[in-house]
Amino acid sequence: KQKALVKDLLGKGFETEFHSNCKALHLDVPLQFKITGAEGTTNRQLGFQAIANLPPSHVLSEGEQTAVALADFLTEVKLNKSSVGIVFDDPVTSMDHMRKEVIAKRLVEEAKIRQVLIFTHDIVFTQYLTSAAIEANVNFLGRTISRPGDGAPGWVDLDAFPHPHYEKEAMGVANQCLQE
């Protein structure tokens, strides 16, 4: 019964929503879900439509794998129906600047529905988030977390975003990437 229920739930929009998220993240790969498991357990496995038994990790780059995981997560969040906040820790690791931009836009779209907290060291991604939020008329509040070199706990710096000691250099790098 559990396996049938999971198949039914997948049939009621999970796969459609997942592919919609993949499209929003510029992932153009023929992926499909397979339901496996023994009695009492059910697993959802992601695979390629045309290639049996070849795991996506053998074909997709690390950045693409991360984007697939993000698409899967955002699909689960949407189908959950409870509008709870979500937290991301550096969601664009191993991504090129083009993928960072589409992820920023997708997360800003999610911020129209629920609170989205993003921790990142990536100034280019931060710039994409800021621009996407302004364009979508979504409230954006950036903060810098500072930490002294003596091992003491860090603090949220309410006055600096991004932090003044690297702002000029980081914005130059961000603008250069935006022009590419």
Language-model-derived ranges and their functions:
Residues 22, 68, 119:
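Conserved RecA-like P-loop NTPase ATPase core
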Residues 85-94:
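Conserved P-loop NTPase "ATPase switch" module shared by AAA+ and STAND
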Residues 94-97, 101:
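Conserved D-loop-proximal element of ABC-family nucleotide-binding domains
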Residues 102-180:
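C-terminal lobe/lid and adjacent interdomain/linker elements of RecA-like ASCE P-loop ATPase modules
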